[in-house]
Structures are given as C-alpha cells and as structure tokens.
A protein has these predicted regions:
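Non-catalytic, mostly N-terminal accessory regions of nucleic-acid modification and defense proteins
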Residues: 1-173
Length: 173
C-alpha cells in the first residue's frame, strides 16, 4: 500500500528537477555556465522566492531539493521530519497565490510518520531511504530535453498499475 509514497516522492523529484532546470537554464543563458541551483546557499536562493512562485507556482530551497535530500538521506536520523517539513514548505510556498489550490494538501497522503512504514522511527527512515533511492535510480532523463515525457509516462504507468491491482479501471484511481 505504498502508492501514495511512491507517487508523492516521484512528484517531489519532478518538481525539484523542474525548478532546478528552470533556474539553471536562466543562469546559463545569462553566461553563468558553471551555475547549479542545487549548490546555492539557501539564504541566496531566498532572493528568488517571489519570482519563482510567480513563474512556477511554488518554491523549493536548494537544501530541500530531491537531489540534496538524497545525498544526505542515509545520514539523516530525522529523515521523516525533514521530508515532512519540506512537503509543508512546498505547499506553504503557494499559499495566497493562484496556485494555492493546486498545492494545498498535495502531500497529505504521504504520511512519513505512519506505522505502515515501520514500527519505529528508525524503521520508517530506513523505508524512506529505500523509497528515495529507488526513485533516484529511475532513469527519467531531463524532461526538457526529451519529446517523450518520461516522468509523465512513469506516473501514468504507476497509476494504472495501482488501479488495476485495486480492481479499478483507468480513470477510477
């Protein structure tokens, strides 16, 4: 019964890469070829918050990006809390904007403190590390460089797989 975890974390990876690629391309087009948003200090990135929420509808600090959370996930004794704070921050970044309804409750089904993940925090975090690593290893490429939407295809495939295993048809997830 991990569909909400898999789909939620897959979406988290997607929006992390989406905002990173958008910011990186802007910097690269301006001649800053060595720039990588993922390496930027959070305090510097804060300067772009309002603009990014206006353009993308949400904001994610560099330390909150999927790639950076994955780098340190197996060393984070409070990974469940880290993820909960990140998901709350992503939803909160859209509050009071046109995209608020799109992000409100987006990660509500992704309960990182659920006993479904394990009886103890240590067990839950072990499971979360496995989920993050599994999604990190998915070869989805850069969605902007492809005519095939690998993220969308993976998401759609998983949704239909979960629907069929639940005895539902395609549109009844």
């Amino acid at each position: 019964d991990f569909k909400s975890y898999i789909l939620g974390i897959l979406f988290y990876r997607y929006i992390s890469e989406n905002i990173t690629n958008y910011i990186n391309r802007g910097e690269w087009d301006s001649g800053n070829s060595g720039f990588d948003y993922a390496d930027l200090d959070d305090s510097v990135a804060e300067d772009a918050r309002e603009e990014m929420v206006g353009v993308k509808g949400f904001f994610i600090l560099p330390s909150q990006l999927f790639c950076n959370v994955c780098k340190r996930c197996d060393k984070d004794d409070n990974l469940n809390e880290t993820l909960e704070k990140i998901f709350t921050a992503i939803e909160a970044s859209a509050k009071g904007t046109d995209s608020e309804d799109d992000f409100k409750g987006l990660f509500a089904d992704l309960d990182v403190n659920s006993n479904k993940l394990g009886a103890t925090v240590v067990k839950r975090n072990e499971k979360l590390v496995k989920l993050l690593r599994g999604i990190q290893q998915m070869q989805l490429g850069n969605y902007q460089d492809n005519t095939i939407d690998a993220f969308g295809d993976a998401y759609e495939y998983l949704m239909s797989m979960y629907a069929s295993s639940a005895g539902k048809s395609g549109g009844e997830y």
